[in-house]
């Protein structure tokens, strides 16, 4: 009997396996669990906010009807284990949802259990960007993902032109995943994290000090702090003691700092001094009447400051209330059952079999995700990836006892000085921020980078060349001098910080080393930079960063030249023979055309044949000087003459200019006219050993490698050019203009032929993304502006008078191809004028001599007779033809009248 009574008690106390407890569709009370640390920075505001939200929900007649919403709050007391166990206790009771946990680390664990039990977990403080809905379908983040906060920081870094940052974070999932997201966003902006400085989750002051000392020794001065509320302020205190809150530093804190300022304001004076000039972010909540009313109400609820977490906590409760209401409207029931898998395992001492599955969990989850309402924080609506719509942040600058808003960040438009509601009424004009007061009370934008003060000297690779010691020279005692070295030293001396370096020769001094290989060694860390005659070409820019060019030097061709002496026939030199022939023929042709057009009615073009020939020749060649005395009377003749005089003007001007140059400028001649000549012939071509010129000639100009001859020094240039192709030398040498000018300074028998056919420059090479390249570029520009660059150039590269003579090459003779367009226009005009004139003559011939034309046709049917009659008409003077025609008509009239009388 006792055992029977005991079994009854157990049966009443514990529901049988598989038994389901069903509550009515509209229960009197719906329970929601909430776990957080009451005394934490976030906890002391969200408790007040959720109590206010529950009160407002239960007082509202438009939601839940007769059902009362109840939130059961459990204090985790800063204990990670309790943060996990408390939600599990809620899952043993009839709780439809849980708000929390507070930290991302514990939220990840609880979300696994919630997925099995189909109980939604809502958190506005667990912002770990790696918690995806695919892995945790029942985890819902009701604030903004940290992914957007890191995107905002990346935009700030790019806005100020910085390239590298240091990231300080807690060594847990929240810190590591947040910094990983920051690295991804920075890489999209072509920036990067140069140093990831991790601290233990609960660091000591000694831990912080050791880490900040390492940060101070790094090059980047842009420091992003993704910290915890617990040790974030302590970090700034240590940084100030180490002098790291001074001018030149940039500190960017995630929204943990703005939360502290909003919640605990006013902060102690010492704390405020520690964070002066820091930039921090805060979740943006648009202004509204609802928000203003809540802010006024908040001061009556608590003395604690209002942070954005309180606003999101309030909206989260309302979001759940609306979702519960929609859940009931869909016919949902609050019912729980045991998980068969857990039941099979057995509860044991852990009582796991007490965990219950929310039967309507999936439907309730859909109701939550479909909520679309306007709350204190703005629009509460989820996207397809379960992030809230319209992510935005305020960008704050800590100044004085508080902060000032220097701008906003929006996911769709980036940085702006206007909030979203004002941007809708204005045109977007790029990313902007207001001015910032930086650490050290500086308003100048920090450079963001300093030379690393780690005591190591930079290894600067300098090519040890066998040629042109004026450019770079390595002495026997190891001293390195030259134009390039002096420019580099002068630029380094202009930097606002010390850069210790040592020059290291690259090459054996006998064979010219490859500058491309020197640049490659910079990428591998053998050298920290490259200084010398390093030409900036595409291949090298893919491996390293280059400074502003300090020498403009393209490729040119140098070849043997001979001086052209004076000649009695120098006046024929401006035109090629073909040009002279065509010009002379054009004079004769135009004269003949003018004679044809003017002969019939212009007495100046009539007379004996001998006179007409002389007149035609005289008229043709007198147009060369615009001194022709014969006038043209026909319109066609005038048109042809105007066009011809324009052609003569162009030819005459070109001839005069070319002849002037020939007679006044020292002339040199060479069979090589430029790079085009070298491409068409098969002569050997010299190039500097170890230079990029070889690859350029082969790959860009398609010159066969067998034609290329490497030359090491100016002496080898000289010998190869003097020997020529016939004696084992070269027809020409292709090299950069800077070298050729040095080569020609004392060799007048050679000269530059043709035009410079590439545009390149020399620059200093640095590793990719090296801020030193930017600073040295600015220093090079400063050298150019203050005249120091020219003084260094004059010291090493000053050319002698002979180099100017060597650069003077024969003026190209004017060819027909330069004027063929003019001759074509003139020729077309002549042909058209003759065609029109012929048509007019045929028409006049038919009108003035119809009887003669018909009679001649009847009498003489041969074509030659008809042509002879027409030519006679054309040759006849126009007045004589008209008079003859008039007499013939009179005779015809008289004859006609006599015949009528006889009749």
Swiss-Prot record:
UniProt entry tagged with the keyword Transmembrane helix: yes
Record's GO cellular component terms: plasma membrane
MF GO annotations: calcium channel activity; glutamate receptor activity; ligand-gated monoatomic ion channel activity
Taxonomy, superkingdom: Eukaryota
Any single biological process term in GO: response to wounding
Region of interest (Disordered), ranges: 881-903
InterPro entries tied to this protein: ANF_lig-bd_rcpt, GABAb_receptor_plant_PBP1, Ionotropic_Glu_rcpt, Iontro_rcpt_C, Iontropic_Glu_rcpt_pln, Peripla_BP_I, Solute-binding_3/MltF_N
Keywords: Glycoprotein, Ion channel, Ion transport, Ligand-gated ion channel, Membrane, Receptor, Signal, Transmembrane, Transmembrane helix, Transport
Residues bearing attached sugar chains per UniProt: 65, 207, 300, 333, 411, 425
Main subcellular location: membrane
Tissues showing expression: Expressed predominantly in roots and siliques.
Phenotype when the gene is knocked out: Reduced wound-activated surface potential changes (WASP) duration in the systemic leaves, resulting in a decreased induction of the regulators of jasmonate-signaling. Glr3.3 and glr3.6 double mutant has no detectable changes in surface potential in systemic leaves and the induction of the regulators of jasmonate-signaling is more strongly decreased.
Keyword Ribosomal protein carried by entry: no
Residues in the Extracellular compartment per record: 26-576, 660-821
Residues annotated as signal peptide: 1-25
Location relative to the cell: Membrane
Transmembrane portions of the chain: 577-597, 607-627, 639-659, 822-842
Cytoplasmic side: 598-606, 628-638, 843-903
Composition skew (Basic and acidic residues), residue ranges: 881-892
Topological relation to the membrane, as annotated: Multi-pass membrane protein
SUPFAM superfamilies: Periplasmic binding protein-like I, Periplasmic binding protein-like II
Subunit structure: May form heteromers.
Cited function: Glutamate-gated receptor that probably acts as a non-selective cation channel. Mediates leaf-to-leaf wound signaling. May be involved in light-signal transduction and calcium homeostasis via the regulation of calcium influx into cells.
Family according to the record: Belongs to the glutamate-gated ion channel (TC 1.A.10.1) family.
The protein's name in its UniProt record: Glutamate receptor 3.6
Name of the gene encoding the protein in the UniProt record: GLR3.6
């Amino acid at each position: 009997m006792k055992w029977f009574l005991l079994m009854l008690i157990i049966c009443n106390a514990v529901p049988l396996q598989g038994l389901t407890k069903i509550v009515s569709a509209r229960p009197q009370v719906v329970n929601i669990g909430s776990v957080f640390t009451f005394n934490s920075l976030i906890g002391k505001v969200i408790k007040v906010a959720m109590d206010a939200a529950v009160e407002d929900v239960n007082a509202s007649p438009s939601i839940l009807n007769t059902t009362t919403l109840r939130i059961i709050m459990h204090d985790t007391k800063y204990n990670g284990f309790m943060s996990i166990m408390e939600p599990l206790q809620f899952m043993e009771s009839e709780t439809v949802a849980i708000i929390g946990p507070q930290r991302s680390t514990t939220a990840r664990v609880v979300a696994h259990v919630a997925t099995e039990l189909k109980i939604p977990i809502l958190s506005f403080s667990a912002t770990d960007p790696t918690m995806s809905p695919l892995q945790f379908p029942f985890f819902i983040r009701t604030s903004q993902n940290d992914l957007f906060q890191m995107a905002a920081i990346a935009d700030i870094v790019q806005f100020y032109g910085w390239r590298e940052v240091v990231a300080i974070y807690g060594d847990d999932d929240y810190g590591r995943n947040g910094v990983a997201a920051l690295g991804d966003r920075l890489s999209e902006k072509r920036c990067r994290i140069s140093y990831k400085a991790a601290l233990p989750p609960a660091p000591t002051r000694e831990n912080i000090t050791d880490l900040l000392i390492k940060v101070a020794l790094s090059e980047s001065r842009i420091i992003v702090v993704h910290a915890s509320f617990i040790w974030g302020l302590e970090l700034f205190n240590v940084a100030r003691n180490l002098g790291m809150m001074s001018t030149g530093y940039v500190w960017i804190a995630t929204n943990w700092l703005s939360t502290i300022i909003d919640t605990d304001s006013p902060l102690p004076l010492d704390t405020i001094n520690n964070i002066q000039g820091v930039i921090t972010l805060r979740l943006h909540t648009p202004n509204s009447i609802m928000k203003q009313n809540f802010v006024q109400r908040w001061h009556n609820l608590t003395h604690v400051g209002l942070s954005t977490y309180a606003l999101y906590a309030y909206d989260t409760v309302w979001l759940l209330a609306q979702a519960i209401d929609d859940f009931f409207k869909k016919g949902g029931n609050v019912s729980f059952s045991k998980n068969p898998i857990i039941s099979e395992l057995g509860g044991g001492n852990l009582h796991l079999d007490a965990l219950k599955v929310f039967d309507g969990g999936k439907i309730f989850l859909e109701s939550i995700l479909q909520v679309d309402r306007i709350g204190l924080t703005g629009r509460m609506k989820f996207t397809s990836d379960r992030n809230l719509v319209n992510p935005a942040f305020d960008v704050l600058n800590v100044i004085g006892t508080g902060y000032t808003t220097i701008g906003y960040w929006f996911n769709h438009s980036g940085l702006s000085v206007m909030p979203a509601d004002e941007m809708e009424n204005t045109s977007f004009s790029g990313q902007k921020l207001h001015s910032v007061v930086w650490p050290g009370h500086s308003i100048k934008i920090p450079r963001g980078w300093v030379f690393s003060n780690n005591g190591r000297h930079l290894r600067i690779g300098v090519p040890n060349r066998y040629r042109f010691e004026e450019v770079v020279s390595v002495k026997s005692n190891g001293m390195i001098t030259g134009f390039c070295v002096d420019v580099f030293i002068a630029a380094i001396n202009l930097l606002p910080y010390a850069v210790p370096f040592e020059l290291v020769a690259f090459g054996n001094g006998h064979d010219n080393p490859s500058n491309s290989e020197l640049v490659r060694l910079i990428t591998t860390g053998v050298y920290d930079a490259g200084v010398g005659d390093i030409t900036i070409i595409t291949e090298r820019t893919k491996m390293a960063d280059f400074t502003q060019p300090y020498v403009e030097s393209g490729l040119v061709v140098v070849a043997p030249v001979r001086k052209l002496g004076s000649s009695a026939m120098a006046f024929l030199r401006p035109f090629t023979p073909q040009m002279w022939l065509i010009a002379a023929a054009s004079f004769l042709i135009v004269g003949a055309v003018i004679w044809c057009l003017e002969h019939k009615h212009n007495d100046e073009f009539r007379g004996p044949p001998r006179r007409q020939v002389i007149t035609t020749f005289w008229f043709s060649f007198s147009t060369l000087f615009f001194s022709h005395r014969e006038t043209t009377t026909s319109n066609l003749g005038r048109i042809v003459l105007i066009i011809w005089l324009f052609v003569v003007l162009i030819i005459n001007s070109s001839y005069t200019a070319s002849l002037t140059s020939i007679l006044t400028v020292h002339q040199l001649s060479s069979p090589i006219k430029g790079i085009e000549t070298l491409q068409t012939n098969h002569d050997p071509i010299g190039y500097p050993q170890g230079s990029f010129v070889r690859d350029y000639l082969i790959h860009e100009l398609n010159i066969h490698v067998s034609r290329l001859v490497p030359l090491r020094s100016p002496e080898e240039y000289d010998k190869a050019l003097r020997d020529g192709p016939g004696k084992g030398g070269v027809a020409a040498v292709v090299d950069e203009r800077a070298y050729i000018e040095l080569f020609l300074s004392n060799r007048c028998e050679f000269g530059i032929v043709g035009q410079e056919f590439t545009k390149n420059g020399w620059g200093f090479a640095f590793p990719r993304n090296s801020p030193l390249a930017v600073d040295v570029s600015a220093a090079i520009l400063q050298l150019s502006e203050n005249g120091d660059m020219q003084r260094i150039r004059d010291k090493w590269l000053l050319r002698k008078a002979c180099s100017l003579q060597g650069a003077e090459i024969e003026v190209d003779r004017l060819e027909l191809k330069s004027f063929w367009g003019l001759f074509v226009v003139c020729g077309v005009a002549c042909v058209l004028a003759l065609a029109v004139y012929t048509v007019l003559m045929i028409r006049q011939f038919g009108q003035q001599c119809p009887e003669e034309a018909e009679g001649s046709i009847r009498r003489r049917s041969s074509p030659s007779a008809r042509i002879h009659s027409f030519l006679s008409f054309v040759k006849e003077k126009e007045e004589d033809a008209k008079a003859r025609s008039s007499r013939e008509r009179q005779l015809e009239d008289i004859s006609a009248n006599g015949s009528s009388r006889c009749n």
